[in-house]
Amino acid sequence: MNRGRLLCRFALLSLIVLIPAVARAQGTMADYDRAFAMRNKYQGLGINITERSYWIDATSRFWYRKPVKGGNEFILVDADTLVKKPAFDHEKLAAALSSASGQKLTGLSLPFNSITFVDSERAIQFIEFGSTWTCELSDYSCKKSGPAPAGFQSRPPADDTPSEFDNDVVDGVTYLSPQQGQRGQGAQDGRPNPDSQKEASPDGKWEAIIQNFNVFIRPKGKTETIGLSSDGSEGNYYTFASIAWSPDSKYLVAYRVRPGYRRQVHYVESSPADQLQPKHSTRDYAKPGDALDVAQPVVFVIETRKQTVIDNALFPNPYSLSNPSWRKDSRAFTFEYNQRGHQLYRIIEVDPATGKARALINEEPQTFFSYRPLTGNLRETGTRYRNDVNDGREIIWASERDGWRHLYLYDGTTGKVKNQITRGNWVVRAVNKVDEEKRQIWFEASGMYPGKDPYFTYYYRINFDGTGLTALTEAEGTHSVSYSSDMKYYVDMWSRVDLAPIAELRRVEDRKLLLELEKGDLSELTKAGWRPPEVFTAVGRDGKTDIWGVIVRPTNFDATKKYPVIENIYAGPQGSFTPKAFSVVNQMQALAELGFIVVQMDGMGTANRSKAFHDVAWRNLGDAGFQDRILWHRAVAAKYPYYDISRVGIYGTSAGGQSSTGGMLFHPEFYKAAVSNSGCHDNRMDKIWWNEQWMGWPLGPHYAASSNVDNAYRLEGNLLLVVPEMDTNVDPSSTLQVVNALIKANKNHDLLFVPGANHGAGGQHTTRLLYDFFVHHLLGVEPPDWNKLPNKTEPAAATTGQQ
């Protein structure tokens, strides 16, 4: 076959490329065995590697879990007395839980990862074996105290096939579903709400309901209703989720919604588990350019029944309106207007007595306003942060207007900037606490130290007026801090990809180190052959900006050999994706064991750097930072002769699937082979919120310019496309349209269609085919004939990405 070839359970067939003889020893069965064993090889060998601490309510005590030889221990620390001890008698608890559950347990093999202290710390609760358990620490008795929460999963499934609970998590990266961040925030769900819902007024006298698409009130406990509106209809209805009473119960605001287009994606599940015949299903799924719901705020005066429709001059073309939020003194309510195209974001305040609206804050970037919340999450964050101080008389707001993500203090009465709080060539990553009394902000930031990794997270405190900037963490690494409830103490856990975690207890007042809690011990890991990734930087396309990445080599690395290179790509603009914190298991390592050097870096267009760095993605997702990536590769090759950039492969999932195929289409002179899983190959086919955020609205030629479908004819190298049949994140048709375009262009390619799989299409078969594809096309070695071999070990997952 010289067209699209469906892969089910057979090895890949293709022309063998010419490969230097020095590499012929790579890609052997022994290499596969090492790759398959990588998941479990280092399990339990990292000692004292802590990840997080948990403060106990409003106390000065906290607990954490740490790995030790033979298992794990729970540790309890009192910050006042500096006493550190086991959180409980592990052997006694294991005996009690064994007796109650019928499971054989030891003190170091307790199956739960998390505990909650209850009953004044005289007992602990945890979830295990499908139930919630309570264990008394006085007599070490355990009993079931309830069912496990719905969807709770105490440990990963036996294989890496995504489950219903975790099918949007692949290789530690969270994929956002089409419903998250979509166009409404409760108020614009597009459907009239059932009459049974009611919203009580703060004074307890009234209940607001929706009946026949209109707003009604009734005395609490009564059935007789009073109509506040009569202009609602099936095509222009009021929504219950938007109802907001003023705190003094004199006013009520609700949104009247004109529904947009209800697009659906259709699925045919070919091989359902519960029946022989296929199943058809649909899913609501808005796409770029679709007509959206349009919300109209309406204010009602309860005493007079007066209705005021708010003039929409300040919000004429909404992508979304946030639900109304009242000032505590009922003088006004606010909502946030996100204009279609994301080039105008506005905080609007409305006087309920007059219905007059005014703009308090305007964000009008030339490119896009990243409207998702400022989270502190390396891989998923936006810019939007708002904190209303003193009932909105001041507002703390995040903006990139000076070219970097910083905090500003607004006068909530005049709408004018009082002062910029943070400033400099670095970015605020999250706000942890706002202390109105002391007028201080506790926040996370990165990039403040020239020459250091600009993605490392550090913690700071600053005054509202921008003075008193104080660093609470200073050690070179990425930090994760948890504060006691009174902000008197903090636990600082920090690491790097090449440095095991260090956990310290410090005092906020003077940052004094009170107790070194743990220091990761890697001696056993090192004896077993573990090696950390190498951090590598190179200058990007502008000749001045550093591009940061990591290099992963096989554990049997031989510098006298030539190694083909495989790039793990995810270039979604919602975050940055090269690992910064320590991890024992790096799934890129398994792929490297086959005889490759595997790398990952963040090119321009990703987040957590300057606005200019981020803006490269605007209307240009096809760029994916490739100019920077290729320069980075060339810099590595210039330093290391064994780094063979004549044989570069690339793989990715979701937006990484789009980019990996895009690398083949737009840079065929550099990338020779790609595996693209669950790709959103044409941004007109994918979910509206993610794609319009970066590609803009209205749709234009720039969408086609970035489309892998429209550019499929450019394919020169070897491409494996993976499509999950039941992908609820990316429309499976996105991949199939690429296949169609490749067939029409008479381009050879490979296709794996995975029945029943959701986003990421995980599982050993998918991973093994990725291995085989690169072994075949980059090493020039024929993979094993798996049909004739026993299925010895499940491969580690090798997909990555986010969206």
PLM feature spans:
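Beta-propeller folds
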Residues: 23-501, 505-506, 523, 527-530, ...
